[in-house]
Amino acid sequence: VDKPLVVIVQGSPRMDGNCAALALDAFNACDARGCDAVIVSASMLMTSGGHPCNGCENCVSTGSCVYEDEVTLLYQMLDSASGLLWITPIYFASVPGQLKAMIDRFQFFWARRSRGETLKFETRRPAAALIVGSGNDPFGTEAVEIPLTSASNIAEFNLSKPTVLMELDEPDAILREENAGMREIAHETIRTFVDAVLKWEG
């Protein structure tokens, strides 16, 4: 029997920071619960051959993206997934540019609806998000949550209310003993998310 697949999108350009640590925690939690998990680094994806959307609308007219790159492999992965977990830092009250470029490529999923294609799933699959900040941005996290919600929705996932973790000022802050409580909050979000994935799988 195939295991449920969980896609973990790591949105930070840092490969060894707080988001990367939480992505590894999520990977291990999924594995422990009998799920297959894959960590997708948006930064690596979009700086090692992934193209930003150029607005050509080839996906609308033909049903396929004009680019044949690793992002098209992500489409296939998301179509096969039972859950989607976003983990991203806050950059100027929004998401990092590499993650936004990846999200813009979700136009492919929007084109399916534009072309009148039938949704692949009767019920939306679960999605969750961990949003990591180094301070209390006076502009809040709405500009982070909206693109994650929109992208999840168009790819046939239902994003639950994101968990926001603030005051993580250093790249390794989430691993420090004084932030153990915050890490546990993240772990609880991950556990709840995996519960939802397994429930969706039935």
Can you describe what each PLM-predicted range is?
Residues 1-111, 172-202:
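N-terminal beta1-alpha1-beta2 submodule of the flavodoxin-like/Rossmannoid cofactor-binding fold
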Residues 133-136, 168-172:
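A short, flexible beta-alpha/helix-coil linker loop
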Residues 24, 95, 117, 146-148, ...:
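Alpha-helix termini
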Residues 160-169:
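Beta-strand-loop-alpha "switch" segments that mediate conformational coupling across diverse proteins
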Residues 114-161:
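Short, glycine-/small-residue-rich phosphate/pyrophosphate-handling segment
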